[in-house]
Each structure stands twice: as structure tokens, then as C-alpha cells.
Amino acid sequence: MNKDHKQSLPAVTLAAIGVVYGDIGTSPLYTLRECLAGHYGFGVERVAVFGFLSLIFWLLILIVSLKYLLFVMRADNAGEGGILTLMSLAGRNTGAKLTPVLVIIGLIGGSFFYGEVVITPAVSVMSAIEGLQIVAPSLQEFIVPLSVVVLTLLFFIQKKGTGSVGKLFAPVMLLWFLTLGVLGVRGIIYNPEVLYALNPKWAIAFFAEYRTVSFFALGAVVLAITGVEALYADMGHFGKLPIRIAWFSAVLPSLVLNYFGQGALLLSKPAAIKNPFFLLAPDWAMIPLLILATLATVIASQAVISGVFSLTRQAVRLGYMPPMRIIHTSEMEVGQIYIPFINWLLYIAVVLVIVSFEHSSNLAAAYGIAVTGTMVLTSILSCTVARKNWHLNLLIVSVLLLALLCLDVSMFAANALKIFSGGWLPLLLGFLMFIAMITWKSERFLLLRRIHEHGNSLEALIASLEKSPPVRVPGTAVFMSRAMNVIPFALLHNLKHNKVLHERVVLLTLRTEDAPFVHNVRRVTIEALSPTFWRVVASYGFKEAPDMEEIFHSCGLEGLSCRMMETSFFMSHESLILGKRPWYLMIRGKLFMVLSRNALRAPDQYLIPPNRVIELGTQIEI
């Protein structure tokens, strides 16, 4: 939520229900069905039903309640969460040798999210619309087209922002969770013995009964906790307390009641296995439930899409992705953004997935492997924070990490079979995103190092210009400078070709800190290098966007007055050429050149008026 507009705890808690729990809240649509009637073929056996219910309940307690809500959410970076935030936090107090390892872990976790997010909207919306099979079996052939239509509308409204309809998310999701609970109670009343499954002995009995097959069945149980990363990622919007209150007071009871209600129904009517969620409702409620389920899955999909936009912005600001056009869709909420490239890329991928897999059961078979992979990496990073930042006892952290990894790695291994039934898709997409991010970061680092090594001393140039000044013209010139003590290429080329300088020259460096936000007091530092040269360093958090007007305002407060329409911005446009490299580095270099050519230009990135920008080309060998 916007930090400038404090709201009451009940209001923020209600808002958290509407956004944070969309994904995990729509899991009852398909989870128990896939556990019993999916690819593992357990059927509606008493031990299987009780065993799966027990596993689902204890995963909700151990993974969601204890691991994420009580442990991982303690690791906040100025109140913000998410895998990249956790990566930055973990790297603060570690040595130079360990930091690159933590960066790779964080990037893999972020890449897994990109891979899984393609499946989430597809499986959620399809599972809701498949309720048509219960209402009118003859409409089955329209499930795929209707799913595509619903998601097409969702992706098309992204550019308009969700501020107006977003106010409806919380009431709709609250109604959804109340409906889950009521339907669950309705089922449990007819067969209350199902509550025995709360006892973990039924989970143990399940493993004893089905042995090896039961281990791989964990791949289906994981569907009950997909979306758990959203709890941590959205912490900055709502805060820890509202998210925790929402879970323990509304979401957890509703989920448990609904899962157990479905189990009770199956024990009484095994034929309901074709869709136990919808068959839990009375006939008169089918159509309203279908509409409500569709709305809930659309809201869940919206939360995932917003999460992708947020993660992408963080990656861009931290230097792991090339600059992209980021549009703010709300004047009130700083977190509401729209990234056209990511939006349409995700839309194409989601539609292709729906058309290719055709049924939510096929998608569920591919769902979960990237989620569990991210859970493993989150455990490693959070325990690193516990040791290095919180200074917990090494033995305690080691035991905690071992316990978490036993659980997470078991679920990740159980999902390994999904690779052959579609799980390769999120892994492939995640791998491609990881390659793109690591390529951009590493090649950009090498490029800046090359510029620094071959650059001339800034101090020497300023001293020379003060002794033998060139022709001066009125006004202020701003030169974007990446390296602090190296002459910007644009400044050199301006002197070489135009042989003039402005009366005042500002060398502007933009820095991204590993904190989500930077206080305005620390925003800008100014250093006078000579009577006509100034160095300005503007610092921003990885969840903020540089604002040139704000920078100029801060400069004015420090005594350096700059007016946008009286300032010329000189920027270098780099033309990259590949030098001699091994074949594998040649491929990486070509990918970097493609990313660079399609990156958002600096004037567009910093919203500088086009008529105030002068771009000077320079050729650099990489």
C-alpha cells in the first residue's frame, strides 16, 4: 500500500486478502482432484483421501504458517520482501567469495518465478471455467475459447491500471473465502469422520501404504501451496501483521474447511472425483459459484501479473535486465505499474499454454516444479540472513536449514517426474530468463570496466580546461556519467567536435542502492570539482524510478540551480562490436548486443524532454 496513506489495520488486512492470497486461495479448485484422480491413479480409497488431506493440512501449517509467515517474513529489507530483496539482504554481510553464489541463487529463484507465472493464470482460469462441464456438459468444447477470452480481456486492461476495479478485489475474495468455508462445512456435516485426517498419523499411514508412489504424489500435494511466495513478495505493500492476520483469521480456516469438505464428499460419493469442488455445492448454487470462481481466478491472475511487473522493475533497477518502458498507472499507488513488453510476452505465452494443454489437469501435471525450486532457494537465502544479519547461533541455523531443506528438497524431488509431463516448460522459460539476466549483468559489468580502463582522468581534464578554457556558451550541460572518475564519452566527443562547453557542466551519476527506498535527505550529493564543474550523485532504491525534475529540485536546495528547459543533456549512444572470443562467449556477446539494441533509451528512461537531449555516438569493442 502507499506508505503516504496510512489505513486502519482491518482495511489493510481486507486488502491483503484481496491481493496476496489469490493464487493459494484458488487452489481448492483442482488440488484434491489432481491428488486422487490425476496421473498417480490413487482413486477414492479411504487411506488415500485421509492421507492427502493430512498432507495438505500439515503443508499449510509447516510451509505457509511456520516457514513463510513466521520465519521468512522476518527477513525484510526496509519492510520489503521478495526473492531479489532477500538476495540483496543476504549479500550485505557476506564475503566477496560468497556474494556471487547468493546472487546466482537469487537470480535462479527470480527466473523460476517467471517460468511458473506462465502456468498460474492458465490453470486457475481454466479450472474455474471447467465448472461448465457440471452445469452443462455440452459446453465442454467452449472451455478453452472462453479461457482465452477471459485472459485476453485481463491482459488488455493492464495498460488502464487496476485502481478502479482493484477496490472490488478484496470484497470478492472475502466472499470467495467465506464460500469456501461454507461449502466445506456443508460437506463435513455429512461425513464428520473426515476430521480425523487432522492427525498426522494419516500422512504416515499414507506413505506406509503406498510406499514409493506416495513420495511422488507429493508433486500433487504441492498444488495446495502454490502462490506461497506471494505472501513474502507482497509484504512491502501490506506489512507483516495484516498478512498474518488475514491468513490465520480467514484464509487458513477457509482452505482447511473446503479441502476437508471435498474429502467428506468423496468418501460419501466417490463419483464426485470428476470435480469435487463444484459438486460440493447444491445444484441451485452452481452458476453463481461458477461466476464467483471465475472472478476469483481472474483476481489471482491479476496478482501474479502485478508480481511479474514488480519483479521486472526490481531486476531492471538492480541492473539484471535492460531498461524497459515502465508506465505508472496510478497517481496514488506507487506500486501500480505496467510494463508493455512483459505484459504482451506473458500474454502470448499464456495463450499458447492454454491452447496446447487444453485441460487444467494437464497443466496441473506441469505445475509446481518451479515453485518448489524457489522454496529451496528461499530457505538457503533466509537462513543466510539469519546467520549473517541476525547473528543467530550457527548450530541453530544449521538445524533449521537442514529441517527446511528436508521438506523443500523432498517436494522438489517429488516434482521431478513432472518434467516429462510438461514441467519442462516452466524450467525452460526460467532457464532462458536466467541466461538473459546473467548475460546482461556480466556483460554490462565488463563493458563498464573496459570504459573505466580506457578512460582518461577526469581531474586532469578539468585542470586542463581551467588553464586553457574553450569557448563557453550560456546555460547548463548535464553529462550522464557511469564511472565517477572517468571522463564521459559524450563530454570528450562534444569537445572534439563542437570545441565548446557550457558555462556550467554537471556530471550526473545515478546509483541504485540495495534498499527498496532512499530517503529524500540522502537523495542527492553535490561536489564542486571546479568553479564550472560539478559532480552530482543521485541515489535511488530498487523500487524507485529516477526522476530528473526531483533531482534538479534537490540540486536547487543545495545551491546548484538547474532548470529543465535551460539545460542540455549530452548522452553517449554506444555502438557495440564483438571482439575475438571463444564460441560460447561469442553467443553471450551477441545476446547482449540484441538486448542492448532493444533497451529503452536513456532520454525515455529518465523522462527527459527530447528537445533537450543531444546524443553523441561512440563505438566500443566488447
Swiss-Prot record:
Molecular function GO terms recorded: potassium ion transmembrane transporter activity; symporter activity
Keyword annotations of the record: Cell inner membrane, Cell membrane, Ion transport, Membrane, Potassium, Potassium transport, Symport, Transmembrane, Transmembrane helix, Transport
GO cellular component: plasma membrane
Membrane association type: Multi-pass membrane protein
InterPro entries (UniProt xref): K+_transporter, K_trans_C, K_trans_N, Kup
Main location: membrane
Domain of life: Bacteria
Localization per record: Cell inner membrane
Reaction(s) the record says it catalyses: K(+)(in) + H(+)(in) = K(+)(out) + H(+)(out)
Membrane spanning stretches: 9-29, 52-72, 99-119, 137-157, 165-185, 213-233, 247-267, 276-296, 337-357, 363-383, 394-414, 419-439
Coiled coil: none
Family, per entry: Belongs to the HAK/KUP transporter (TC 2.A.72) family.
Described function: Responsible for the low-affinity transport of potassium into the cell. Likely operates as a K(+):H(+) symporter.
PANTHER family from the UniProt entry: LOW AFFINITY POTASSIUM TRANSPORT SYSTEM PROTEIN KUP, OSMOTIC STRESS POTASSIUM TRANSPORTER
Name of this chain's protein: Low affinity potassium transport system protein Kup
UniProt source species: Sodalis glossinidius (strain morsitans)
Top-level taxonomy: Bacteria, Pseudomonadati, Pseudomonadota, Gammaproteobacteria, Enterobacterales
Designated gene of the protein: kup
